[in-house]
């Protein structure tokens, strides 16, 4: 009965601006934790307890908060006045939150930076202006910042990164990776076998271990891609507009290569002695060859860019 009462509890909504908070309630393991905080710095961490705990100081413009749980859903919202100025005036919330490792995290905010660690059952973090730092997360993971960097380490599962004006730095990820960025560089060191990227106005620096599927589409950016191993049947595709691509493959790479360059693009082949063919008409060139049995496929296409193939 006590657990049921706790499950339906709703903490008082009215608190003084900037007031300290220290609350803890029982929640369902494997449920969903929804957190909404519009401004400040939020530190979220998974633990082994079937409890949700929040401590720290609320935004000095906050109009109370809600903390409630029902069934497998828990909600913590820092309420803000409707006419809130989302600028930098005043202090945002400074909160540390603990939640079950087995629960799913959903976070939304505006001018807020978020750190999330040690969660095993998926996480979605969406902010407008702020940095996201994530480590040791697993499951379906989506990290989105419109104006801010995203830093990640030791993520596993189905992982998606999105930024508009910010950099993405991914270390030691595994599973499937998706990147979408505008006006920001992307760096990844990953064992993911399935990687896809779309970006505009940003450089790419990839170090990939074992690739089955790789798709890169870039506009106005430089790409440097190191692939330690192409798995049998692997499919690699690269397209660029006004952007260069340097690809480094293993010395014993087995693949069929089909490379095209248009509008004065250039192809440099340092994998084999095969020569680039110039088009009879127009400023285009192409290169086709197979090496070591051709167990994978590599297709590249550039408009006004430079493509370089290397082994190491």
Language-model segments: residues:
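Intrinsically disordered, low-complexity terminal regions
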Residues: 1-312
